[in-house]
Amino acid sequence: LFPPYHDPFEEETFIIGPYYTQRAVRRSPFYFTEREKHELMVATAILTLAFAIAFTGGLRGLIFRWRSFILYLVVAALAVITAFALHEIGHKFAAIHFGYWAEFNYFMPGLFIALLFSLAGFLFAAPGAVVIHGYPTRRENGIIAAAGPSVNLALGIFFFSLSSGLNSFAPLAGLLFYFVAAINILIGAFNMIPLPPLDGSKIIAWSLPVYLGMAVLLAIFLFFIYF
C-alpha cells in the first residue's frame, strides 16, 4: 500500500511507508518526501490555473480576455501558494511537532473537478490533504487542525496591512495584496465551518474557546475585507 522511503536524515535507515522513526522526524522537522513535493507542486499548479480561469470568467473569459488571464495567473499563483500550500504545510509541521509522520497527498479527482468548475466561472475544489499516520489525541488533533486556519489568518492580516500601506503610492500592488489577503481570510473562514472533514470540526471538539476566538477573528477580518 505504501511505497518504500529512504530516510533523508539517517543514511543507514530504510523506512517502509508511514513507519518513520520519530528520532529522524525530530532531528529535521522540515522533511518533505520527493513524492510529497511533486504532489504539492502539482496541486498548487492546477489550483492556480483553476483560480485564474474562474477569475477571468471561465471558458468564455479565457477566449475573449486572455490578456486578463495572464494577469490573473500571477495573482492566483500568489494567492494559492499562500492560502493553500502554506495552509497545508502548517498542518504538516504541527503534526511533526507532536512526533507524527505527516505527508500531503493530492486528490486528483478533486483537482480535475476544480478545473471543470473553473471553466464555468465557479470555484469548487477538493485538492487533497495532509495525511497523518498515528493516533493523535483530541488536543493534538485540534492543534494540528488549528494550524491551517491560523496560517491563513496571519497571512491575511499581513497582506491586508501591506495593502493598506501601499494603496497611496502603489495602488496596483496594493490591490494585488488586498486580493491575496481576501483569499486567505476566505479560505481560513471556510475551513472553520464545524463540519467534518473541515478543520473547524476538529478544533471545536478540542476547545470551544479556541474555536470561538479564531472564528470571531476571521469573521472580523472577513467583514473588513469584503464589506
Locations of regions flagged by a protein language model:
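Hydrophobic transmembrane alpha-helices and their immediate loop junctions
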Residues: L1-F227
